[in-house]
Amino acid sequence: MCCMASIDCLPDELLVGILSFILTNEAASTSILSKRWRTLFAFSHNLDCNDSIFCHPRKNKRKSFRYFLYKTLANLEGYSRIKKLSLKFDEKSNIREGHGKLVVNHWICNALEHGVSELHLCFEYMGWY
């Protein structure tokens, strides 16, 4: 039952619109609110991801950014269109390690398959030439 002040009374389309204004990492944290909220962030048309949220002294925290973004892109509904993909990597990022460049390329290709119209990539100094 909905009360007049409850955010749960809002239609999914409006909630997805609201979630599209915050970082995808933060929008994903709303999935703990209820079963209804579990997948709402994945319907957002704007994916704005910043790996500094995941950059932690422990390496496995940094790898969790790769996993989070991989799962987010993989779980997009087939009909979902991405308007904007924004990826920000800071100097502490481990994206240079191992297959990092291939992973970023995969994310970009996946976004292109979903019709991305804006692509923002920010690599703070990483020593790449």
UniProtKB/Swiss-Prot annotation:
Domain F-box: 4-50
InterPro entries hit by this protein: F-box-like_dom_sf (IPR036047), F-box_dom (IPR001810), FBL60-like (IPR055294)
SUPFAM superfamilies: F-box domain
Record Gene3D superfamilies: 1.20.1280.50
Entry superkingdom: Eukaryota
Secretion signal, residue range per the UniProt entry: none
The protein's name in its UniProt record: Putative F-box protein At3g42722
